[in-house]
Curated annotation (Swiss-Prot):
InterPro entries xref list: Ribosomal_uS19, Ribosomal_uS19_bac-type, Ribosomal_uS19_CS, Ribosomal_uS19_SF
Keywords attached to this entry: Ribonucleoprotein, Ribosomal protein, RNA-binding, rRNA-binding
Superkingdom to which the source organism belongs: Bacteria
Function (record text): Protein S19 forms a complex with S13 that binds strongly to the 16S ribosomal RNA.
GO cellular component, one term: small ribosomal subunit
GO molecular function, a single term: structural constituent of ribosome
Source organism: Parasynechococcus marenigrum (strain WH8102)
Upper lineage: Bacteria, Bacillati, Cyanobacteriota, Cyanophyceae, Synechococcales
Protein name (record): Small ribosomal subunit protein uS19
Family to which the UniProt record says this protein belongs: Belongs to the universal ribosomal protein uS19 family.
One GO biological process term: ribosomal small subunit assembly
Length: 91
């Protein structure tokens, strides 16, 4: 179920301030954040945001198709190493 329209999208205040500051100064340095729940807004297009995945920060370049999604969707937290092969012979 989606978020109520009267509330608007969630974005962390610190992240919003950093993006607005970079838009004012035309700076495109990487923004580091732990806020995976923040919604991607149109003002973020063209920025690179390093999203924390629990171990390290994964750089995510924001494009138009990402608007409306959450930052955490683009920084996977689990690594799949493959299924275990069956033992030959078994029982």
């Amino acid at each position: 179920m989606g978020r109520s329209l009267k509330k608007g999208p969630f974005i962390a205040d610190s992240l919003l301030r950093k993006v607005e500051k970079q838009n004012d100064t035309d700076d495109k340095s990487v923004i580091k954040t732990w806020s995976r729940a923040s919604t991607i807004l149109p003002m973020m297009i063209g920025h690179t945001i390093a999203v924390h995945n629990g171990k390290s920060h994964v750089p995510v370049f924001i494009t138009e198709q990402m608007v409306g999604h959450k930052l955490g969707e683009f920084a996977p937290t689990r690594t799949f190493k493959g299924h275990i092969k069956d033992k030959k012979g078994g029982r």
